[in-house]
Amino acid sequence: MTSRRQFIRDLGISTAALPFVSGLPAFADRATVGRKQRIIVMFSPNGTVPAKFWPSDPNDLKTSPILSCLAPFQKQSMVLKGIANRVGGDGDRHMRGMSCLLTGARLHPGNIQGGSDSPAGWASGISIDQEVKNFLQKNKETRTRFGSLEIGVAVPDRADPWTRMCYAGSNQPLAPLDDPYQMLNKLYGQSKDRETYTSILDSLGSDLKKASKSLAAEDQALLQQHIELVRQLELEMQASAKQGKLVHPEPELDPNIELVNDNTPQIARMQMDLLINAMANDMARVGTL
């Protein structure tokens, strides 16, 4: 009997397209029906150690010191090598390497000067994680409280193309939350303030709608983005109120970890634990770190 993967290969589909095409309903395994679909993107801005990352034997992840932890999932894993981000345009390679990674779109012309001759602005398109989030949030069966979580570790305290990987759309960067204690509060904050927050959001949304009537078309478009953000926060509050008993208990974080560079390994572990816990409790099905 021909396997699903072999069947797709026989169709002449490239290896790079295989992970995407194999997830289509027509090619889905019966065993995967009903399973929750999730996507997590992890980005290492300083790269990796090639000699310890790439398996010496492509068919054995145990030959990679870094990937050996995935050995039990060898048959479900695929390691791709040789993919290059060739998006050109304004900005230096570091700016494009971050802001164009998930968008595949050039940076807008702007006034942020990097290490190249031409300054640049934000990415000109939506990132793939947000595209997936929007798709899942449209369906009642796959909708979650947050939709997606944008998490960071030691992200510089500034807003520019070097620090923004996720985009809700053209010129709409999403800031990652790099404080695990703030992330914990976002996920499991006490519900006693919910009514106060809801009241404030209701009032804010109403005021923004009134203001939009007297603005020019360009300003109305920008204000509409703010209105949509308020609406998203309202939906998150409603979902939080409806959430029942947690499948997995709220994680406990060491309260004595300072957010300093020397503690990056511990902070990264805390953020990963929070992301996994949120996924397990179905608060989101899309995450970036």
Which residues make up each language-model segment?
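Ligand-binding pockets and gating/stacking loops
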Residues: M1-T288
